[in-house]
Amino acid sequence: MDRASELLFYVNGRKVIEKNVDPETMLLPYLRKKLRLTGTKYGCGGGGCGACTVMISRYNPITNRIRHHPANACLIPICSLYGTAVTTVEGIGSTHTRIHPVQERIAKCHGTQCGFCTPGMVMSIYTLLRNHPEPTLDQLTDALGGNLCRCTGYRPIIDACKTFCETSGCCQSKENGVCCLDQRINGLPEFEEGSKTSPKLFAEEEFLPLDPTQELIFPPELMIMAEKQPQRTRVFGSERMMWFSPVTLKELLEFKFKYPQAPVIMGNTSVGPQMKFKGVFHPVIISPDRIEELSVVNHTHNGLTLGAGLSLAQVKDILADVVQKLPGEKTQTYHALLKHLGTLAGSQIRNMASLGGHIISRHPDSDLNPILAVGNCTLNLLSKEGKRQIPLNEQFLSKCPNADLKPQEILVSVNIPYSRKLEFVSAFRQAQRQENALAIVNSGMRVFFGEGHGIIRELSISYGGVGPATICAKNSCQKLIGRHWNEEMLDTACRLVLEEVSLSGSAPGGRVEFKRTLIISFLFKFYLEVSQILKKMDPIRYPSLADKHESALEDLHSKHHCSTLKYQHMGPKQHPEDPIGHPIMHLSGVKHATGEAIYCDDMPLVDQELFLTFVTSSRAHAKIVSIDLSEALSMPGVVDVITAEHLSDVNSFCFFTEAEEFLATDKVFCVGQLVCAVLADSEVQAKRAAKQVKIVYQDLEPLILTIKEAIQHNSFFEPERKLEYGNVDEAFKVVDQILEGEIHMGGQEHFYMETQSMLVVPKGEDQEMDVYVSTQFPKYIQDIVASTLKLPANKVMCHVKRVGGAFGGKAFKTGVIAAVTAFAANKHGRAVRCVLERGEDMLITGGRHPYLGKYKAGFMNDGRILALDMEHYSNAGNSLDESLLVIEMGLLKMDNAYKFPNLRCRGWACRTNLPSNTAFRGFGFPQAGLITESCIMEVAAKCGLSPEKVRMINMYKEIDQTPYKQEINAKNLIQCWRECMAVSSYSLRKAAVEKFNAENYWKKKGLAMVPLKYPVGLGSRAAGQAAALVHIYLDGSVLVTHGGIEMGQGVHTKMIQVVSRELGMPISNVHLRGTSTETVPNANVSGGSVVADLNGLAVKDACQTLLKRLEPIISKNPKGTWKDWAQTAFDESISLSAVGYFRGYESDINWEKGEGHPFEYFVYGAACSEVEIDCLTGDHKNIRTDIVMDVGCSINPAIDIGQIEGAFIQGMGLYTIEELNYSPQGVLHTRGPDQYKIPAICDTPTEFHISLLPPSENSNTLYSSKGLGESGVFLGCSVFFAIHDAVSAARRERGLHGPLSLNSPLTPEKIRMACEDKFTKMIPRDEPGSCVPWNVPI
C-alpha cells in the first residue's frame, strides 16, 4: 500500500501528476485555480445546474472498452480521478486552434446569450456525441436534462442539437403520417412582404462536419497502466482527511473494519453535498471504484443481480436491454425502475451516482427505493465476518438497527427479482419540475393475484417524500389481502392508507394536503392501470374501465420540440454589407462555447490576493448581543474579520431616500443580513473561519414576513403612490355589475448563472483602486466604493468585461458587497476577491417583489369595464432599495393593453423582515399585469363571455391616452392580437380543446391568449443619457466603448453593427473591449430594455462626428481604404477619436397630478399558449406557444427573438414553477437548484413559434428599433391562464361553477388542489392554528 500515493491523470491530453493531494479538493476548483482552465464554471456547487460539466473517460482492461460520461466537476474529488482522462471545454477546441462542431453550432445557432452556462451545455452534447455520433433527439434532450440556462429559453440550443441528428431539420414526430418538413411550416400562413418565415436563423450548410476520427484520443499511457501496471491500494491524505482507494474486495473489507464509520463513496453525489452544505465532516473516506465485484451483472433464474458500484446510468442501460429481451410479465419491476431512472437527476448525476449509494443513502425522497422495496429486492452484504443477505424493506429504509448494515459491512450487490405472471408493478412521482427535480411524493406499488380471479394475494405500497424515510403501508396492504380488485377495494384502500401514512401539518417540505392527495391519487392510478391490464387479459371476467377514467392512464401530451420563426427581411434598397437587420451571431458566441470568454472570477489570481466571505444573520429581527471573533481569527490563513465597528462612519450609503447599512451594527432585520466579513488567504480558509464566528441574538418583536402582516402592523415605506383617471366613484353607480377580488403573487429568484463576483485591486499609488465586478451599474459601484474609502471618484475605476446574467439583480446589492470588499482591500493593501456561493447569493440579494393585488371592477353585461379601483402591495423586504420605483412602474403599466375610462390605483411598498427585494426584469409589470388580467378573467366569467372577447372589447384600438395622459397609438397592438389569433389558429384549437375536455375526465387542456402593451423608458431624461467613445487607429481598425453592460442581451454585438453601418466598414474591423468608468464616465444602469437604444444613439453620434471630420479626406480619395484615410487624417492632425453623446428622451411624471410623459414608446405583442394538465397530480405540459411581437425595425432579429423567448420562459417559470419558501422564522429554504426550480429543457413548449411584425417606424429610436429585453416576461402568464382554463374545465365537469381564484405561481400543488374531486375531499384537514407550518406563503 502506497502511503504517499501520487495522483496521475490526464486533462485535455496532458499528464497531471500531484504529489500532495488534499482529499477535500474537488475537480472544479482544481481546474480553475491550479490548471487555470476557467471554461468550466461554478454555478451551484451541488451538481444541480450543469455549468461545471466535463467529460470523464475511463479504460476498462477487462472489456477493453473506453467509457466516456459527463460529470459535474463540482462534486468530483480529484483523488477519484487516478488513471482517468478529463476533458474540459478547452480541450475540444479553441479559437487559437480549431473550434469543435459542437462549439460552432451552439454559437451560430444563437444558443448563447450571457454564455455562462454554455461550456457545460457544450460538454454535455460533446460527451453524448462521443458515445453516439448520430444521436436521436430524445438522446440529446436527455443529455441536456442536467443543464440549466436562464437566458435563452432553450429553443436555439435545441436547434443546435438537432443539427447532429440524422434528420436534423425534422421534429422526428410525424403527424398524419407526414414529416413536418413536407408540410407547410407548422401550418403558419405566409405573411406580407417584409417578413420571412423559417424554422431557423442560421445556415446549416456552413457548419463544420462532425468527424469522430479527429477527437482527442484516450491517452495510451493510461491504457498501458491499466493493463500492465500492478494495481495497488492508493492513499491520499491531508491534515484533516484520509482517502483510501483499495483495489481488492478483501482490502475494502479491511478498511471498513478499521474505519467502520467511514463512508464508502463512488460518485460523491450524496456525501459531497452533505459535507458542503450541511457541515458534515468525515475524516476518512473509502473509495472502492476499482473493485470488480461491485460492478457485477448476473442473470439468474430468479432475476437480476446488479453490483452496488454500477452507476445509475449503467443500471438504466442494463434494464433497458433486459426489458427488450424478456417477456413483459417478468420485467414489471424493471419497467417501473426505468420510468423513474429517466427523470432522476440529470445525465451527469446518473453517470456519477451508484446504485448502492442511492440505496444506502436512504433519502426520504429516493425515487428508486420505493420500487425496490415493493419489488421484494434483497441486499447482499459482506464484511470480514462473512456474507449476509437482508431484505430491502421498511425496516431497512427506516434504519432499524436489526435490519440495517452493520458499521463494518458493505453492500456488494442488489437482487432484483423477476415479476411473475399476474404480478404488476408501477411507479409514480410528482415533482415541482418534470425532470431533474426531487419528488414531492413518489411511490412504488405491486400487486400479485396468483391464479385467483382478481383476488389480491400480495400487495405492497411504498411512498417517498412523506416522512423521514420511505414509508411502506404494510398494515393497509395486509388488510386488503383476499379482497377483489374493484372500486370497493379502492375506497377501502384509500381510507386505510391515509390512516397509516399520516402526515403532520408541520411536516418538513410543507405541501401537506397536496402530499396527502397524491398518496391516494397515485393509488387510484395504480388501480386503473392494473384494471386495464386485467381487462385486456380477460375481457369477459373483468369489467371495462369507465370511459372517463381512461385518460388517467395516459401520459401528458409530449412530442419532440419544433419551432418556427417569422422575422423581418431586409429590403432590396439596403446595402448588402450593411449588417443592420441581419441575424448576426452574438460576437462572443464562439468564445462562450470554447470557454475563452472571461468572467470576473476567471481573472488570474493577483499576488497576495485575499478572499472575503460574509457572515450573515440567522435571525429575522433581533438585537445583536455579542459577536465573538476569537475562534475565527485564530484559524490558519485568516487575516482579519471586518465588522461595522471597522467601517464606522462609512458603514452606510444612501440609495434613494434612505441610507442602508453595509454591516449590521446593533440590530438585524432579516435572515441573510450582512454582519461581518472574514478575510483569509484562500476561499476554503475564509469559509471555514466564517462558520466559527459566534453571534448571540435577542429576538425582537414584531416579526413581519408577509404582506398581510405588514398591512396589519401598518408597516410601509413612504410615500404611497396613487394614479387616478376619470371619476371612479361615479362610474360605479352606472355599471351593470360590480365584483371584488384579489390575487397573490410570489417572488422570484434572479438565478443568474454567474453569482455575485468581484475582485478589488489596490494600485499601490495615489490611493487608486481597480474594481473588476459583475454588475449592471459600474458608475454606482464607483460611487459607493469611493464614498466608503473617502476618495474622489477619479481614484476608483470600475471595469466590466461581461456579466453572466443579471436581470436586475446586479446593481444595488452588488454595491454593498463591493463597498465592504473594497474597504478590506484598502485596509490591508492587498487585492481581495469575493464570489458568493449560490446559497449565499440567494439568501442575501433578494429578488422579484411578491405582490398582493386587490381589485374592484364595475362593468357592463357586454364585458365593458367602466370602473376599476385597485390596490397594489409589494413585499419590499427590510430596506427600500428600488421598491418605490417598482411600485411606480407597476402603477404606470397596470392598464396593460386596456382602456379603462375610470381608474384608481394605489400602491404601497411593505416593510418586512425579509432580505430587501430589488429590480427584476419587467420591474413591477409582471405583477401588475397579472392582477389586471385576473380581473379581466373574473369579469369574463361573470358575463358568461370568453376572456379573449372581454380582452378585445376593452383593448386600446386607436390613438388614445393612457391613465397618465400620454398619447398612445394602438395600431400595432391590434395587429399583434389579430395576427396571433391567426397564426395560432385560435378558434380551431379552442374547439379542439373543448372536444378533448369533453372526452377526458382526468386530463384537461386549456388555451389562453393575452395581449401586451409594454411602455419603454426610464421616467426621466437624466436616467436616459448615454455616452460612447470611438477610436480609429492608423491601420483602419476601430475600437468602440460605451456605457452599456453586456449581460447576455447582445448590446455589444448591436453596437458593433451600428459602427459598421455608420462607418461603412465590415464588422470584423470593429472591436469592443468592455465597459469601464475610465473610458465612459457617469453611465446609467443597464436595464429597462433601453441599453441598446441609448448607447446605440451615442455610438451613432460618435461615428457621425468622425465621418464629418473625415468627409473631405474620403471625398478626395473615395476608393481608398480606412487605413489610407486614417493615415491621411493623422498626417493632417485631424483627431481620430470622438465622444458620442445622447441626452436622453424627454421624460417626466408628476405624481401629484398623476400625469406626464414617462415613456418614449410602447412595445406591443400577444401570446397564445395551450397546456395539458393531469388533474390527479397537478402536473402540466406546455403544448404550444405562439408569440407575435412588434419590434419596430429589428437591428438583429436573432438577438431580438432570443430576448423574446428567454423572457417568455423566465416569465413562464415565474407564473408556474418558481416558488420561494420561507420558514415561519424568516429563513429561506430554497437556496439552490435542488430546492428552487427554474424552467429546464423539459419545460419548454413542445411547439414554439415566434413572429415579428413587419418593420414599422419608431422615429425617435435607433433605426426605428425597440427594446425587447423585459416585455416578454409578462407573456409567460399566457401559460398561467391556459392552466386556469384547464382547471376551470375540470371544475365545471365536477359541478363546481363558482368563481375560481388561483394565485401565482401556479404550481402542481395549486393545480391539483383546485381540481377538487373525491380524493381531495377524502384527505384529513388540519385545523387552522393547530400546528406550526414548515413554510409561510410570502
From Swiss-Prot:
Residue ranges of every copy of the 2Fe-2S ferredoxin-type domain listed in the record: 5-92
Protein name as catalogued: Aldehyde oxidase 1
Gene expressing this chain: AOX1
Domain FAD-binding PCMH-type: 236-421
Subunit structure and binding partners: Homodimer.
Residues with PTM Phosphoserine: S1068
Gene Ontology BP annotations: lipid metabolic process
Lineage: Eukaryota, Metazoa, Chordata, Craniata, Vertebrata
EC numbers for this chain: 1.2.3.1, 1.17.3.-
NCBIfam families xrefs: mam_aldehyde_ox (TIGR02969)
Cofactor annotation comment: Binds 2 [2Fe-2S] clusters per subunit. Binds 1 FAD per subunit.
Residue numbers annotated as active site: E1270 (proton acceptor)
Transmembrane segments: none
